Amino acid sequence: MRWAKTVIVVKIQGGLGNQISQYAMSRWLQNKYPEHQVKLDASWCDIHAPGFELVQAFDKNRLQYLLATPKDVFRATGIFHGDTANQVWAKVYNKLVRGGRKLLGNSTEIQQQVASGYPVTQQIYHLDKEHDWYINGFWHNWDYTSMLPQLQNELVYTPWTEKKFAALQSEICGCNGVAVHIRLGDYSGSEHDILPASNYYKDALQQVLDKLPKPVIYLFSDEPEKAF
């Protein structure tokens, strides 16, 4: 039996920045492979904070996406996910399928390797149009410049409903606002923490001061008391 239309499933995971890149990848894939139906697998968001932030932050009426069902994910990967995957028989089945596909080299799951940065995964350019695919990665490095107008039309923030945020938005739009994000939290003391041994923020702000008249800095952080 053959399904009516081949499907490409893009995994949604991580915070809003990651989810934006994954959404952009899904739109790029839909443009490149119009014969496929591209869907988003948001099941990761059901069990991890902060959830499916993409639809919380942006206007749902502008976003263009279809959610993948468990059946879609099974089609694309050939293995069980979610609650079913925790059952003993499903674990055995999944292990056998993964092992067989690794041995034969015919996996339809593309896993972006991120150990050393975010390298381009060339296989993305040459997907077999007769197969279903599961795309798992972050895709920060992807060149989306050719489709920026499309993304800008779709990724439109939901209007503020609280008066204080609406007032702040009006204030920012009326000046040379510069947003500075200082990530602390899980980054503090880790290999990703650039604050102790770097002038990254100082140098960046100096460039802003040199090039922009009367900038207003809006600083945000997951630990604002430390960021200041």
Language-model features, listed with the residues they occupy:
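Extreme N-terminal starter segment of soluble prokaryotic enzymes
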Residues: 3-9
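Short amphipathic alpha-helix
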Residues: 21-29
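A short, Lys/Arg-enriched amphipathic alpha-helix followed by its capping loop at the start of a domain
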Residues: 28-35, 211
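A short beta-strand-loop structural module common to alpha/beta enzyme folds
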Residues: 33-47
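Short beta-strand segments
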Residues: 39-42, 181-182, 216-221
